[in-house]
């Protein structure tokens, strides 16, 4: 078996194992951590199959590379979404350029946290160790441009978002969250009455 070399262990941690090429079958296989069983990639979870290509190609991602990443949060549970945001920031800090689309308020908030921590850590460096975040997992907001795509009945509006006190605020995501919270509260009130 030939194992790809790795830079960061972030993806390896997310998949909780290793992906390697079986030299006999010429197919990639997944080996769960602390297990000798090799699983054909198509038989693994969507989290593993979705991250496989990036995991395999990670060693070839160089400074100046341009990566397009559609919904990096797709098929990832919330903890893995947070790890993915950190991994993306480390790639950007290594000089990669990225174009990312997302529908996830959780993913956007994790990116916001990593951007805001860049400012906060300048006057409170201990906060990084307190939150278990590495220096290469935060970055300045001036490396980022965020656009909010909002669809109404006849057209799509595209608005560049400003980085404010609490990061980038995407109204299109917040409106849906507010409606869900209002609906949930109304249902809970009805149950309690």
Residues of each region from the PLM?
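Conserved H-loop
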Residues: 97-106, 111
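Mixed-charge, low-complexity intrinsically disordered segments
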Residues: 110, 116-141
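Phosphate-coordinating catalytic segments in nucleotide- and nucleic-acid-processing enzymes
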Residues: 1-66, 94, 135-193
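Conserved hydrophobic alpha-helix in the ABC-type ATPase nucleotide-binding domain
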Residues: 83-85
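Walker B catalytic acidic pair
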Residues: 70-72
């Amino acid at each position: 078996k030939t194992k790809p070399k790795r830079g960061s262990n972030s993806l390896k941690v997310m998949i909780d194992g290793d992906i390697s090429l079986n030299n006999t079958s010429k197919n990639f296989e997944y080996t769960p951590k602390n297990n000798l069983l090799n699983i054909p990639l198509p038989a693994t979870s969507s989290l593993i199959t979705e991250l496989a290509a990036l995991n395999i190609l990670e060693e070839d991602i160089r400074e100046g590379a341009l990566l397009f990443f559609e919904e990096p949060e797709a098929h990832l549970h919330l903890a893995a979404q947070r790890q993915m945001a950190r991994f993306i920031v480390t790639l950007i800090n290594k000089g990669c350029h990225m174009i990312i689309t997302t529908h996830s308020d959780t993913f956007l908030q994790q990116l916001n946290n990593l951007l805001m921590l860049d400012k906060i850590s300048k006057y409170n460096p201990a906060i990084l160790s307190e939150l278990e975040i590495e220096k290469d997992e935060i970055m300045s907001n001036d490396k980022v441009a965020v656009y909010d795509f909002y669809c109404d009945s006849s057209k799509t509006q595209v608005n560049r978002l400003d980085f404010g006190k609490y990061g980038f605020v995407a109204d299109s995501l917040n409106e849906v969250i507010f409606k869900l919270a209002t609906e949930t509260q109304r249902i809970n009130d009805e149950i309690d009455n």
